[in-house]
Amino acid sequence: MDVEVKKNGKNAQLKDHEVKELIKQSQNGDQQARDLLIEKNMRLVWSVVQRFLNRGYEPDDLFQIGCIGLLKSVDKFDLTYDVRFSTYAVPMIIGEIQRFIRDDGTVKVSRSLKELGNKIRRAKDELSKTLGRVPTVQEIADHLEIEAEDVVLAQEAVRAPSSIHETVYENDGDPITLLDQIADNSEEKWFDKIALKEAISDLEEREKLIVYLRYYKDQTQSEVAERLGISQVQVSRLEKKILKQIKVQMDHTDG
């Protein structure tokens, strides 16, 4: 399916209760409900994919990986949660794409963009000496006789992913980057980066670990319970409390 179709899909968005009914059917083995959930959430997946473009990967490949994250979120979503499905799904989709990129090794940046990035770096050094200050993007573009947007694109493409994704929790050197949430101007509104960071920073260490294991490591509540030495019921209760706390703080921030 063409990327533009995914990006500009005009399917009417489902209401939250409709989404949850489809999730219930899907979790009970209804393949049609599962397929419809994918179809209706293409825009959601594509919005996440846009965060990872210009990394040397085909958008279609990233979209397919994102759909795997979407399906995992369908399978793992607890219907007793008082939270929108999209709020739960976005971190899962992000995590799936990040794992794909991490497991694939060094992020592949196209050779032409790499070469342009090197030219920009040299031009920046030369202009800094000449001007006695850091040159603007437009000055670099004029110097190289290219468009300013090409300068921005090349710099973004060769930048290390670790400098783009801000770490909000780290466990044994493995960072959680839930701040890779995306802003959206439609009625489906997701976590704001700064507010989310503040909400997570207010959690207790055990609560942060639960967020990390559940939303970044994709562990089940039973696996988290075993890791923490508590029951699955306790994990479920704590997770609901955490989501409610974050939701309240996010709502307060939005207000």
UniProtKB/Swiss-Prot annotation:
Effects seen without this gene: In spo-63 (loss of residues 27-255); no spores develop, no induction of sporulation-associated enzymes.
Alphabetized SUPFAM superfamilies for the sequence: Sigma2 domain of RNA polymerase sigma factors (SSF88946), Sigma3 and sigma4 domains of RNA polymerase sigma factors (SSF88659)
DNA-binding region as annotated in the record: 221-240
Annotated control of activity: Interaction with SpoIIAB inhibits sigma-F activity throughout the cell before the formation of the asymmetric septum; after septation the interaction is confined to the mother cell, and sigma-F activity is released in the prespore. Fin, a second, forespore-specific anti-sigma factor is induced in 2 successive waves by sigma-F and sigma-G, by antagonizing sigma-F it allows the switch to sigma-G factor and progression to the late sporulation development stages.
Effect of R237K: In spo-560; 1000-fold decrease in spore production, 50% induction of sporulation-associated enzymes
Keyword Protein biosynthesis: no
This protein's UniProt keywords: DNA-binding, Sigma factor, Sporulation, Transcription, Transcription regulation
UniProt-listed Pfam families: Sigma70_r2 (PF04542), Sigma70_r3 (PF04539), Sigma70_r4 (PF04545)
Cross-referenced CDD domains: Sigma70_r4
Record-linked InterPro entries: Cro/C1-type_HTH, RNA_pol_sigma-70_dom, RNA_pol_sigma-B/F/G, RNA_pol_sigma-F, RNA_pol_sigma70, RNA_pol_sigma70_r2, RNA_pol_sigma70_r3, RNA_pol_sigma70_r4
Residue numbers covered by motif Polymerase core binding: 61-74
Consequence of changing V233M: In spo-561; 10(6)-fold decrease in spore production, 50% induction of sporulation-associated enzymes
GO terms, biological process: DNA-templated transcription initiation; sporulation resulting in formation of a cellular spore
Protein function: Sigma factors are initiation factors that promote the attachment of RNA polymerase to specific initiation sites and are then released. This sigma factor is responsible for the expression of sporulation specific genes. Interaction with SpoIIAB inhibits sigma-F activity throughout the cell before the formation of the asymmetric septum; after septation the interaction is confined to the mother cell, and sigma F activity is released in the prespore. Responsible for expression of csfB (the anti-sigma-G factor Gin). Associates with the RNAP core only in stationary phase cells.
Similarity remark: Belongs to the sigma-70 factor family.
Subunit: Interacts transiently with the RNAP core.
This protein's name: RNA polymerase sigma-F factor
Species, as recorded: Bacillus subtilis (strain 168)
